[in-house]
Amino acid sequence: MAEKFESLMNIHGFDLGSRYMDLKPLGCGGNGLVFSAVDNDCDKRVAIKKIVLTDPQSVKHALREIKIIRRLDHDNIVKVFEILGPSGSQLTDDVGSLTELNSVYIVQEYMETDLANVLEQGPLLEEHARLFMYQLLRGLKYIHSANVLHRDLKPANLFINTEDLVLKIGDFGLARIMDPHYSHKGHLSEGLVTKWYRSPRLLLSPNNYTKAIDMWAAGCIFAEMLTGKTLFAGAHELEQMQLILESIPVVHEEDRQELLSVIPVYIRNDMTEPHKPLTQLLPGISREALDFLEQILTFSPMDRLTAEEALSHPYMSIYSFPMDEPISSHPFHIEDEVDDILLMDETHSHIYNWERYHDCQFSEHDWPVHNNFDIDEVQLDPRALSDVTDEEEVQVDPRKYLDGDREKYLEDPAFDTNYSTEPCWQYSDHHENKYCDLECGHTCNYKTRSSSYLDNLVWRESEVNHYYEPKLIIDLSNWKEQSKEKSDKKGKSKCERNGLVKAQIALEEASQQLAGKEREKNQGFDFDSFIAGTIQLSSQHEPTDVVDKLNDLNSSVSQLELKSLISKSVSQEKQEKGMANLAQLEALYQSSWDSQFVNGGEDCFFINQFCEVRKDEQVEKENTYTSYLDKFFSRKEDTEMLETEPVEDGKLGERGHEEGFLNNSGEFLFNKQLESIGIPQFHSPVGSPLKSIQATLTPSAMKSSPQIPHQTYSSILKHLN
């Protein structure tokens, strides 16, 4: 166990000393690897997130996350226990000490699962979805009151304990502080929210957004809980916007004009009536739930409900209790930002670039949309910053095929292919988003030196080239079809390469062969070969010893039936099979049986009626064979056990001439004269002729089997012996 633990620690570089044991990987967070481990001090399982500090940018993100999660304390937020350095060392409160470390460990609360795993099993009941949505809004109300944006809300970052149905928000690796008194335009990172949960404003202005982006993501998550599938699952940002416009109405004219300047091919004169409203995307939900969702998924962030307003909606009235929905008592402000601390130089801080509003009462919705460029110059870069890395999901930017990289983007050394990216953060005119693009280029499946989405695009002739030009639309359509064909071909090749179909067929054949061998092993008697052998033997001369054995066997059977304490030598199943074959034997000689009665009091019945039971089943299963002779014939027992009482002999004498009667136990005692069915009288060893065959039958469900000619009885005995 110790060797396995040390190996796992060495592979993933976990260095926490001997305090934490039983490491198990959980996944990757926004900026680190997450493991679960058992804390030996308290014997409790915790989640540990490792953040590698390789450059100033990673240090800044780590410090930002640590500052945020240390201050956030809420029932619906994953709790953080402590922050550790290498070898499990305790970190000081001096945030500048992070610059001297190569890694940091965040020990936090362990949760059973996440919402993404739950939704893989299918949609939730509306009541469960409403309960989880209430807890999500309750946590968002606290987070936003602390002037924090999560910026990466998705089902995988919402953790759940299934026992008490408690939901908690986690993974603040992409969260940041945003003081509403300051304009953060141009200083916000781009494309951080997972593509399927990005709001329309985030798609149009990726570096100018507000807390409303978290509310849009929450609405998409609520719809996903109700349907079990992603609400807007676009392959790239252009398709993502198209899917949104098909279901979300555009009410304000200024929003429609902005869209008209970006993607006019999708814009109509009247955008208030979408083609596929939410009622079609979410059939079966209640009217209150639909109204609640429509007020969250609005195109304009100014019309969107805040977390506090959503909690006051009538749909949440059964859970909402404002006195139990706390807000942060110590919110973050502009001085809590970390850029100046990390860069260790006041000249490198971006605080001096921020503009202080004269009226600090402005809300987040009152920020100007555009500041440095006209609205007509807005371009939409159809990049898909997907979390997956498969070749099928890689999105191609049509502009990459144009000549001259430097003609497409700003003349800035940060985007020069020959320019080293490492020292770029030292320049005073460096923008943090450019370095972020360079750093995460390998994860977003795109060119490593793409510029900002909208405001940093400069085209060759300094003219606005909208995304509705024919060549670009055709390129995007062709790419989509080709990627679909490639996906189909690749899926087939993988299936053939992995041998899934062949393996499945081989497994089925092996199962069938094993079942066949098992049947051959368990079957007690092959009736086909037996019949063939008996027919061949029937033509041979009957030896004397066989006749003697038949007489002895007949006598033994008649005496065994009179001994009530002797257990039956065959199972109930063989008795049923014997009854069926006897019924067929009687049917063969129907003429001699038609007038025979069974004397059994009130329970008597015609024996020909008894033999016709399940006759229809004989037609359906005429090829079914059973070994019924085990019932009619058994070996002779020890003479000491065959003694009978005189009373029973008397009864037997009284009924000796009867062909059949019912005893008290419901069994049918059969006594058939051999001469009536054409079997010759054999002589017993004592010289007395054998004139009858006796057997015991139990009325029950019978199965049919082929008839055997009476001439083969002696050969059958030979086979049994």
From Swiss-Prot:
<comment type="subunit">
    <text>Heterodimer with ERK4/MAPK4. Interacts with (via FRIEDE motif) MAPKAPK5. Interacts with UBE3A; this interaction may be indirect and mediated by HERC2, possibly via HERC2 interaction with NEURL4.</text>
</comment>
<keyword id="KW-0808">Transferase</keyword>
<feature type="short sequence motif" description="FRIEDE motif">
    <location>
        <begin position="332"/>
        <end position="337"/>
    </location>
</feature>
<dbReference type="GO" id="GO:0106310">
    <property type="term" value="F:protein serine kinase activity"/>
</dbReference>
<feature type="modified residue" description="Phosphoserine">
    <location>
        <position position="558"/>
    </location>
</feature>
<feature type="compositionally biased region" description="Polar residues">
    <location>
        <begin position="701"/>
        <end position="715"/>
    </location>
</feature>
<dbReference type="GO" id="GO:0005737">
    <property type="term" value="C:cytoplasm"/>
</dbReference>
<feature type="modified residue" description="Phosphoserine">
    <location>
        <position position="452"/>
    </location>
</feature>
<feature type="domain" description="Protein kinase">
    <location>
        <begin position="20"/>
        <end position="316"/>
    </location>
</feature>
<dbReference type="InterPro" id="IPR008271">
    <property type="entry name" value="Ser/Thr_kinase_AS"/>
</dbReference>
<keyword id="KW-0832">Ubl conjugation</keyword>
<dbReference type="GO" id="GO:0032991">
    <property type="term" value="C:protein-containing complex"/>
</dbReference>
<dbReference type="InterPro" id="IPR017441">
    <property type="entry name" value="Protein_kinase_ATP_BS"/>
</dbReference>
<feature type="short sequence motif" description="SEG motif">
    <location>
        <begin position="189"/>
        <end position="191"/>
    </location>
</feature>
<dbReference type="GO" id="GO:0005634">
    <property type="term" value="C:nucleus"/>
</dbReference>
<keyword id="KW-0539">Nucleus</keyword>
<dbReference type="GO" id="GO:0019901">
    <property type="term" value="F:protein kinase binding"/>
</dbReference>
<comment type="function">
    <text>Atypical MAPK protein. Phosphorylates microtubule-associated protein 2 (MAP2) and MAPKAPK5. The precise role of the complex formed with MAPKAPK5 is still unclear, but the complex follows a complex set of phosphorylation events: upon interaction with atypical MAPKAPK5, ERK3/MAPK6 is phosphorylated at Ser-189 and then mediates phosphorylation and activation of MAPKAPK5, which in turn phosphorylates ERK3/MAPK6. May promote entry in the cell cycle.</text>
</comment>
<feature type="cross-link" description="Peptide (Met-Gly) (interchain with G-Cter in ubiquitin)">
    <location>
        <position position="1"/>
    </location>
</feature>
<feature type="active site" description="Proton acceptor">
    <location>
        <position position="152"/>
    </location>
</feature>
<feature type="modified residue" description="Phosphoserine">
    <location>
        <position position="386"/>
    </location>
</feature>
<keyword id="KW-0131">Cell cycle</keyword>
<feature type="binding site">
    <location>
        <position position="49"/>
    </location>
    <ligand>
        <name>ATP</name>
    </ligand>
</feature>
<dbReference type="InterPro" id="IPR050117">
    <property type="entry name" value="MAP_kinase"/>
</dbReference>
<comment type="similarity">
    <text>Belongs to the protein kinase superfamily. CMGC Ser/Thr protein kinase family. MAP kinase subfamily.</text>
</comment>
<keyword id="KW-0963">Cytoplasm</keyword>
<feature type="modified residue" description="Phosphoserine; by PAK1, PAK2 and PAK3">
    <location>
        <position position="189"/>
    </location>
</feature>
<feature type="modified residue" description="Phosphoserine">
    <location>
        <position position="556"/>
    </location>
</feature>
<dbReference type="GO" id="GO:0005829">
    <property type="term" value="C:cytosol"/>
</dbReference>
<feature type="region of interest" description="Disordered">
    <location>
        <begin position="701"/>
        <end position="721"/>
    </location>
</feature>
<dbReference type="GO" id="GO:0060999">
    <property type="term" value="P:positive regulation of dendritic spine development"/>
</dbReference>
<dbReference type="GO" id="GO:0004707">
    <property type="term" value="F:MAP kinase activity"/>
</dbReference>
<dbReference type="GO" id="GO:0005524">
    <property type="term" value="F:ATP binding"/>
</dbReference>
<protein>
    <recommendedName>
        <fullName>Mitogen-activated protein kinase 6</fullName>
        <ecNumber>2.7.11.24</ecNumber>
    </recommendedName>
</protein>
<dbReference type="GO" id="GO:0032156">
    <property type="term" value="C:septin cytoskeleton"/>
</dbReference>
<feature type="modified residue" description="Phosphoserine">
    <location>
        <position position="665"/>
    </location>
</feature>
<dbReference type="GO" id="GO:0046982">
    <property type="term" value="F:protein heterodimerization activity"/>
</dbReference>
<keyword id="KW-0723">Serine/threonine-protein kinase</keyword>
<dbReference type="GO" id="GO:0006468">
    <property type="term" value="P:protein phosphorylation"/>
</dbReference>
<dbReference type="InterPro" id="IPR011009">
    <property type="entry name" value="Kinase-like_dom_sf"/>
</dbReference>
<feature type="binding site">
    <location>
        <begin position="26"/>
        <end position="34"/>
    </location>
    <ligand>
        <name>ATP</name>
    </ligand>
</feature>
<keyword id="KW-0547">Nucleotide-binding</keyword>
